[in-house]
Amino acid sequence: MDPNFSESLNGFEYFDGNPNLLTDPMEDQYPPPSDTLLKYVSEILMEESNGDYKQSMFYDSLALRKTEEMLQQVITDSQNQSFSPADSLITNSWDASGSIDESAYSADPQPVNEIMVKSMFSDAESALQFKKGVEEASKFLPNSDQWVINLDIERSERRDSVKEEMGLDQLRVKKNHERDFEEVRSSKQFASNVEDSKVTDMFDKVLLLDGECDPQTLLDSEIQAIRSSKNIGEKGKKKKKKKSQVVDFRTLLTHCAQAISTGDKTTALEFLLQIRQQSSPLGDAGQRLAHCFANALEARLQGSTGPMIQTYYNALTSSLKDTAADTIRAYRVYLSSSPFVTLMYFFSIWMILDVAKDAPVLHIVDFGILYGFQWPMFIQSISDRKDVPRKLRITGIELPQCGFRPAERIEETGRRLAEYCKRFNVPFEYKAIASQNWETIRIEDLDIRPNEVLAVNAGLRLKNLQDETGSEENCPRDAVLKLIRNMNPDVFIHAIVNGSFNAPFFISRFKEAVYHYSALFDMFDSTLPRDNKERIRFEREFYGREAMNVIACEEADRVERPETYRQWQVRMVRAGFKQKTIKPELVELFRGKLKKWRYHKDFVVDENSKWLLQGWKGRTLYASSCWVPA
């Protein structure tokens, strides 16, 4: 690599081909590169902040599965000879000139939801169908005298009340949730005008590492305000510190889970009542964890099928009316308070550039591209270098979103990236693939060409693939790894959530989930004030949904299936990969950056078994590695 690579980034010392030149990471005076990522999220937030309801920025498996079930019967009944949707991947591709080539790669006839989801209705019609589905699902709710849950659709604010009526032979617990289902807004226009001057100005502010628009000046004050407010809040609490009762939430939660697993609803409800009385979404880390897990346990009591869980979660959040902009805003605060995502992005960019020197074409296949947060800084970094690829190709693979246009989100991502490449004079070609089952993607669909350097990136998304729990012979997780191996990439960057709450047995999975999420809630408690609205929203929309899926769902509905980095290592070797060594200097560089960027001292960066590990207070939460075909 070019030893002056840090200078090529216009002053942002992201990487250096000779790490020995960065033995003292504190020497540079440049702002943290995470500011660039934060600005990118901010500008996407500007696009989303139109006041209308939009789908969440993240994949909601339960909502998608419920939509599938609704549409399956409708499509079966209404499909005629004149319209027969092809069971195929939706692929859209275009080059930097803006011309679009739409094509579908036909596959063998399969069920409608085998490859991708196709919605034949507008969003408004889907909402009406969804309401009917809720009514049908309500018929299957338990009506035992021991536990009655009444879901009322009201227009007033959500009220949660738990009333205990102890008798000689029964325990009745009643919980009322408002369910305010609003009509989903109409789909927006098909194409985004990337040539619009307002969008062009936005791009200048978002991702250009321009010395005249210093990201430290733009965002450092906001980031520090968030962190300083945490310190101020702690000081204020010391003055009004009251002695509070210590509650062992882990024990209460575990006992409740054990009662549920044995079918003892009465005992489970007694523990739930105790947890509800002591927990709070606005309390300390333990109280927030208990509140989150209590919701998940109650959902499991209601039923472990996807539609029923989705109905329950919608009842909990119906009055909150969060838009996609709200979710992105919460995600932005997460990025400012945690280095996990930023360092994972830098690690992948480092490894890709290391193998792409002097390549005529660099082709990046990104499994789970979503908004493509990490690629704008990559595009700018190669624009002024001589030893970089002369052309960039990106194939973005993502799960389809609900609605009439499953590939809309990743198409918009491609247009943003195409605009960046056009502004930096980087020849660019993009292809979007929306597929519900990544293991069914074929190598021909990826359009791999000779004489190009092929890099595969999978950031935190392979955990959502099914594993051997369903079938040891047809494991989607191994099938995707086999697909990547058959692609014969020059480098494969794999980032994971390091967790062991993927056991098929509920109690084992529950205990591990408690330990994992305890660290995450504690991290927020040490870096953000407790009354921060974005923190509350992030914990609800991200940790809450994940915990709900891990605890309440089973079989195909359970899509949160993380494994430890040691388990992934065995799986990768079995798939035919060998691991590349991580230079110790790179680990030291990242450690130095954590100190320079003023992240909390309890964030940990380490290396073990050729994995770059990131964690909190000694608990490993994320891991990144680099692989090549054996």
Curated annotation (Swiss-Prot):
A motif (VHIID) lies at residues 362-366. Residues 412-444 are annotated as: Leucine repeat II (LRII). One of its GO terms (cellular component) is nucleus. Residues 552-628 are annotated as: SAW. Residues 454-549 are annotated as: PFYRE. It comes from the Eukaryota. Residues 331-396 are annotated as: VHIID. Its main location: nucleus. This is Scarecrow-like protein 34. The gene is SCL34.
